Amino acid sequence: MSASELKEMEQKMEQAVQALSKNLASVRAGRANPSILDSVFVDYYGASTPLNQLASVGAPEARLLTITPYDKSAIGDIEKAIQKADLGLSPSSDGNIIRINIPALTQERRKDLVKVVGKYSEEAKVQIRNIRRDTNDQLKKMEKNGDLTEDDLRGFQDDVQTSTNDYINKIDQLAKNKENEIMEV
């Protein structure tokens, strides 16, 4: 096992953390954030198109999102897509711009969102552990083939475990920060 293989493992772990960050950004914390609409796809001329390719999304105020379609004829389709996305948002249009008022979160909704954050963080931890398992399997094969000594195997496994612990801690910190942001009244 070379340093490049360890680097590759850490890159995969970093990708899992980045995916978690992206998922957490889509969890609404009571303030307007354009990324909460990243999961919205609009049926535009028969094709499922991401909202951010059809319109610019902005947050001019703490509890307001504005969506300015590049093609005004798509306003109705965009409104339908936002309602269908089941984000708990109600879009309103004046013909040129769609406005979405972000309602304040109830305590019950906050608790539900914390559970969603927990689910996302657990999925990321499982990805990290799977990467660790794959790397350890690769190390054991190398030892079996005679490419590694038993001492080298243990040393590399310790390195893998240290990296795993570091990335699990990063995930826990991201989740904790998001939970605090959600529970902030």
Swiss-Prot record:
UniProt entry tagged with the keyword Cytoplasm: yes
Example GO biological process: translational termination
Single GO cellular component term: cytoplasm
Lineage top rank: taxon: Bacteria
Pfam families linked to this entry: RRF
Annotated compartments: Cytoplasm
Location, primary (coarse class): cytoplasm
GO molecular function per UniProt: ribosomal large subunit binding
Alphabetically ordered keywords of this record: Cytoplasm, Protein biosynthesis
InterPro entries membership: Ribosome_recyc_fac, Ribosome_recyc_fac_dom, RRF_sf
Purpose: Responsible for the release of ribosomes from messenger RNA at the termination of protein biosynthesis. May increase the efficiency of translation by recycling ribosomes from one round of translation to another.
Similarity comment: Belongs to the RRF family.
Protein name, entry field: Ribosome-recycling factor
